[in-house]
Amino acid sequence: MAFSTTALRRTLTTSALTAAIAVSPLLTAIAQAVTLNGAGATFPAPLYEKYISEFQKKNPDIKVNYQAIGSGGGIRQTIAGIIDFGGSDAAMTDSDIAKVSKGILLVPTAGGAVAVVYNLPGVSSLKLSQKSLAEIFAGRLAKWNDPKIAADNPGVNLPDQPIKTAVRADGSGTTFIFTNALSSMNSYFKGRVGVGTAPKWTTNPLKGRGNPGVAAQVKRTPYSIGYVEFAYAKKNGLQAAAIENKKGEFVLPSLETANKALSTVKFPDNFRVFEGNPSDGYPIVGLTWLLVYKQYDADKKAAMKKWINWVLTDGQELNDDLDYTRIPADTAQKAIAAFDAEVK
């Protein structure tokens, strides 16, 4: 029996409608999916990777990407407006914020220690006074058996070898934390090198891109010394020096000693803190921020709100496991309230 043309058309139309109805939930899901692209600091990258993995399990309609390119790169891309959020361990300055027409809210996410890592064959434990550490990176102390370093390490057979410093090749919030601490500790370093994300080093140093790059330089170079976020020191099995704090105690980096150092931090309304040489605990610590615009389209704003709220609540539960300090609960709630009030 042959179908009439009209019947055939009716059948095809019905089939097409049925197919459209069947796939419409998929199309709706695709239409509702939002991607948030971020870039910046390597200091919190291990933590942000974990954040993203856990966040997306609970929010499959939001895809978050984060490129660890360094704080300097994160700030530049934020100013250029080519990402949805940035990451930096150096709080943006007023002059940088003024370059962003959409405005910027700094959201603190974690704190942590910057470890001073070293590769000294035959030396399993190293102490460095604030003066010795600062003068090594300012170029004033050139050999490992310098009397000042020897005085920090009685009974240790220090090698008669040149000190090879390793620093960041890129603009870096980790470098900001490190140079801010050393400048607070020592006036010679402050005048010679100063505070910055990409200072002019005077030691002709080895250079590595990102925390992984500096860790790799130290790991493969005997008689070298560098600085990396504590998680990278642990991950790469690097030895960390005990650094003198204001109390005269030599302290190793750890979650406990970083928490002790950051426990007295007071967050102002703009959440920008520059902790130089804390009075207790491990003396080289800092915070890291998400750089959030104050204007988004409706879908991105809704996705950013979910992301920020999660990072400052459920996400904080992950900080301890990766040796990052948590943001105080009251400060986290203030940051959430600031997002709600200021982001349009």
Model-derived regions, located:
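Flexible loop/hinge segments at secondary-structure junctions
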Residues: 32-344
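A general, composition-driven signal for non-globular sequence regions
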Residues: 3-4, 19, 26, 76
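C-terminal segment of classical bacterial N-terminal signal peptides
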Residues: 13-15, 19-31
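Hydrophobic alpha-helical segments with strong N-terminal bias
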Residues: 9-12, 273
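N-terminal secretory signal peptides that target proteins for export/translocation
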Residues: 1-10
